[in-house]
Regions:
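Conserved structural position within tetratricopeptide repeats
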Residues: 20-21, 88, 143, 186-190
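Extended alpha-solenoid helical-repeat scaffolds
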Residues: 163-191
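Short coil/linker segments at helix-helix boundaries
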Residues: 39-132, 136, 140-163, 167, ...
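Start-of-domain marker
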Residues: 1-51
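Residue-level recognition of tetratricopeptide repeat
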Residues: 22-31, 148, 161, 178, ...
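Short helix-adjacent coil turns
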Residues: 6-11, 129-130, 176
Length: 191
């Protein structure tokens, strides 16, 4: 209940981590993760709206509004990670042994969108030679590639999936994360 009373993502996320083990069942965990995901989406949506307005402003040669790029990308990551946890718990059986997902359907479009932004986040950090963040964002994108939740987005990802996987494999290799480098190289070779 403390998680659901938190007003911001960081506080709610902290409370969730502290109280996860004491939550009664998977449904309670799913509800908490859904709430934390929605807090991350609130930040993401606010920054996304500014970015969308900026695209239009560029076309009309109007003033561009600055937005918090780092918060935008971090909130996309946070929403994706916590949303996937919500979906995991949402798919578990209740006390009667029945699986009745309550949050997955509503979260899927938002999570598909935030996951796609992980590619842009990786590009942003690649331009700044920030290896850790490239691996964080592109790695999360690739690590969730086989998640059935994102099956409908597969067609749209085909145009850049192999390239993202190739460069992520290079970054992972440079970081001496050979298991990840091999995994990402395998994804790239399927392209």
């Amino acid at each position: 209940k403390a998680v659901l009373a938190a007003k911001d993502f960081n506080q709610a996320s902290q409370l969730l981590k502290q109280n996860l083990g004491s939550m009664a069942n998977a449904q309670e965990k799913a509800k908490a993760y859904d709430y934390v995901t929605k807090l991350a989406l609130k930040t993401f949506d606010a920054q996304n709206a500014i970015e969308a307005q900026n695209v239009q402003a560029k076309m009309l040669k109007q003033k561009i509004t600055p937005y918090d790029t780092i918060a935008y990308y971090q909130s996309a990551y946070d929403a994706t990670v916590n949303g996937l946890e919500c979906v995991k718990y949402d798919a578990q059986p209740n006390e009667k042994g029945k699986v009745k997902p309550k949050f997955t359907e509503a979260l899927t479009p938002s999570l598909t969108n935030t996951r796609m932004q992980l590619v842009n986040a990786g590009n942003y950090y690649a331009q700044r030679n920030d290896q850790d963040n490239v691996l964080k964002y592109w790695g999360m994108f690739l690590d969730t590639d086989d998640n059935p939740l994102f099956a409908k987005a597969k067609e749209g990802e085909k145009q850049y999936l192999g390239q993202v996987a190739y460069y992520t494999a290079l970054y992972a290799n440079q970081a001496k994360l050979y298991d990840k480098a091999e995994k990402y190289a395998d994804i790239a070779m399927k392209d």
